[in-house]
Amino acid sequence: MRGTVICASKKQRKLWMVHNGRILITLDARFGRASEPTAEGVHTIYWKDKNHVSSVYGSPMPYSMFFYRGQAIHYSSDFSRRGWNGASHGCINIRNMSGLKWLWDRTPTGRKVIVFK
């Protein structure tokens, strides 16, 4: 694949930024629970909000990059604190703040996101 894309694997619990077939960064990722699954498929980052707070749950969602309805890639203090215990409400949780900031800084709106099993 040519260009830059964000790929996320539910099975491997990882997210990558890939440029022209070369992995630029790999981050641990936590996905939605069975009742609120993360949408699989090819999506596009349509909105970014560095200091987003969930209007539904009141939770801080730093470095949010929205790709499908209300689902976003964002930092999760819960994931950072509790690890793999738990799940999101459909978002892709990242526990490495500095790694996510690196990704945020290099991800414009319009960037392709591919979520797969």
Show which residues each predicted segment covers.
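Cell wall/extracellular polymer interaction/catalysis modules
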Residues: 1-42, 62-63
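Exported/periplasmic cell-wall-interacting domains
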Residues: 1-3, 36-42, 47-117
